């Protein structure tokens, strides 16, 4: 007897015995998702989550109505971190099937690497895994990758990454990846993508309480998300030269670790006083943004699980978008809307740049005072390391990267949210 369950779509309401608001009902034929006349993709994703939660490990999407977006919605909800469910669907139109498979590859890689333990993904391993993934989806010969590690970081002047990671026994690393499909080694760099890759964040000497540390294997979620976004863009046909810079370190406590009151002198001459070692993401991103600016690209995007303030403001359902470039922000929000992902703007203004005073350095790594806008001042800090911060730069504070517990739509763990938005934004901007 087959243990596979067929799942159908219906615009009709469920029979009364299933409840007035039921989105799922069962019969001898299998399960039916009741999507209403509006083709509710949220209902499809919630049904996928419910079936996974019931331990149904073999599903066939059957009958009429299954298109690219509905199959994708079901897959998102049905996928969990602890086991590999088997999902079948009738072949879609060729272009839709290609797109679906590319989405699955990109978001599976993103979700899987975020869900791995910090023991499995050290800073150098993160850089290596990201480079291997991009090489696996890019045309042969279009990718070159360099990993700068340990004291070589100091040789190249990447003081922030080295300082944050020096308390760990696991060496820090910067991935410098060059995707160049043009065939011209002198082609201009169209965009630089910068990701925060903190593979575990204890908070350092500004140590996190235990309940806030349990999800800190996912503090490299920005690096994973922006890598997945590039991978999907490549599979969608991206034809411009892109550089990916991942800033990878482990924020730990030891006799060598960064201390409060230490001052970092960056490659651009800026000095930063460390007033909180748990505000470390911005310290590593500063190096990546300086590298990016030196490539003179048209576009710089950075992604980071940077602040609790963004998560407090938006919850798990949106990433925060901060930028001085209103037109680019609008285009990013449009891309997110088209890809059905959550992205929401938070304010970033010149006065935020003045909220990082230090008595001993050019800047403090945190803002002072009561009720300071933490997400905005974190982005303002980053702006000091972008040459033309008013144009062509956006910062994504990835509040929706990871869920500590499951919801009605998502399993616990990584979501992959943002990968599609980044891919579309790159493709659209490259036109």
From Swiss-Prot:
It catalyses: Release of an N-terminal amino acid, Xaa, from a peptide or arylamide. Xaa is preferably Glu or Asp but may be other amino acids, including Leu, Met, His, Cys and Gln. One of its GO terms (biological process) is proteolysis. GO terms for molecular function: manganese ion binding; metalloaminopeptidase activity. It is an enzyme of class 3 (hydrolase). One of its GO terms (cellular component) is cytoplasm. Mn(2+) 1 binds at residues 201, 278, 280. Keywords: Aminopeptidase, Cytoplasm, Hydrolase, Manganese, Metal-binding, Protease. It holds the Pfam family Peptidase_M17. Its cofactor is Mn(2+). InterPro entries: Leucine_aapep/pepB, M17_PepB-like_N, Pept_M17_PepB, Peptidase_M17_C. It is found in: Cytoplasm. Mn(2+) 2 binds at residues 196, 201, 219, 280. It comes from the Bacteria. The keyword Hydrolase applies. Its EC number is 3.4.11.23. Binds 2 manganese ions per subunit. The active site is at residues 208, 282. Its main location: cytoplasm. The keyword Heme does not apply. NCBIfam families: PRK05015.1. Probably plays an important role in intracellular peptide degradation. Belongs to the peptidase M17 family. Homohexamer. This is Peptidase B. It comes from Vibrio atlanticus (strain LGP32) (Vibrio splendidus (strain Mel32)). The lineage of its organism: Bacteria, Pseudomonadati, Pseudomonadota, Gammaproteobacteria, Vibrionales.
């Amino acid at each position: 007897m087959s243990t596979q369950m067929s799942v159908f779509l219906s615009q009709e309401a469920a029979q009364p015995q299933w409840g007035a608001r039921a989105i799922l009902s069962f019969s001898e034929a299998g399960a039916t998702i009741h999507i209403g006349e509006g083709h509710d993709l949220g209902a499809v994703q919630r049904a996928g989550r419910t079936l996974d939660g019931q331990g149904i490990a073999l599903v066939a999407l059957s009958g009429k109505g299954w298109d690219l977006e509905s199959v994708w919605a079901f897959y998102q909800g049905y996928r969990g971190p602890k086991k590999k469910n088997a999902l079948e669907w009738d072949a879609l139109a060729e272009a839709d099937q290609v797109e679906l498979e590319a989405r699955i590859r990109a978001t599976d890689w993103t979700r899987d690497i975020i869900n791995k333990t910090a023991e499995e993904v050290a800073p150098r391993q993160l850089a290596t895994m990201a480079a291997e993934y991009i090489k696996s989806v890019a045309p042969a010969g279009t990718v070159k990758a360099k990993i700068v590690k340990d004291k070589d970081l100091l040789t190249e002047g990447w003081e922030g990454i080295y300082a944050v990671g020096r308390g760990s026994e696991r060496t820090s690393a910067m991935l410098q990846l060059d995707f160049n499909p043009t065939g011209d080694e002198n082609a201009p760099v169209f965009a630089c993508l910068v990701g925060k890759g903190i593979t575990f964040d204890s908070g350092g000497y500004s140590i996190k309480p235990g309940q806030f540390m349990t999800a800190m294997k996912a503090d490299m979620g920005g690096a994973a998300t922006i890598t997945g976004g590039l991978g999907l863009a490549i599979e969608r046909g991206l034809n411009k030269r892109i550089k990916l810079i991942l800033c990878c370190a482990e924020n730990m406590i030891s006799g060598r670790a960064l201390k409060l009151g230490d001052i970092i002198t960056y490659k651009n001459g800026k000095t930063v006083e460390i007033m909180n070692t748990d505000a470390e993401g911005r310290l590593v991103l500063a190096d990546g943004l300086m590298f990016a600016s030196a490539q003179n690209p048209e576009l710089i995007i950075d992604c980071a699980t940077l602040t609790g303030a963004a998560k407090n403001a938006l919850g798990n359902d949106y990433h925060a978008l901060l930028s001085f470039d209103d037109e680019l922000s609008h285009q990013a929000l449009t891309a997110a809307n088209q890809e059905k992902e959550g992205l929401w703007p938070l304010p970033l203004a010149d006065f935020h740049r003045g909220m990082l005073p230090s008595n001993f350095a050019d800047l403090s790594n945190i803002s002072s005072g009561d009720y300071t806008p933490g997400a905005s001042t974190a982005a303002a800090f980053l702006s000091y390391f972008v040459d033309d911060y008013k144009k062509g730069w956006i910062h994504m504070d990835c509040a929706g990267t990871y869920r500590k517990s499951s919801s009605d739509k998502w399993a616990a763990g990584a979501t992959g949210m943002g990968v599609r938005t980044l891919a579309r934004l790159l493709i659209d901007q490259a036109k």
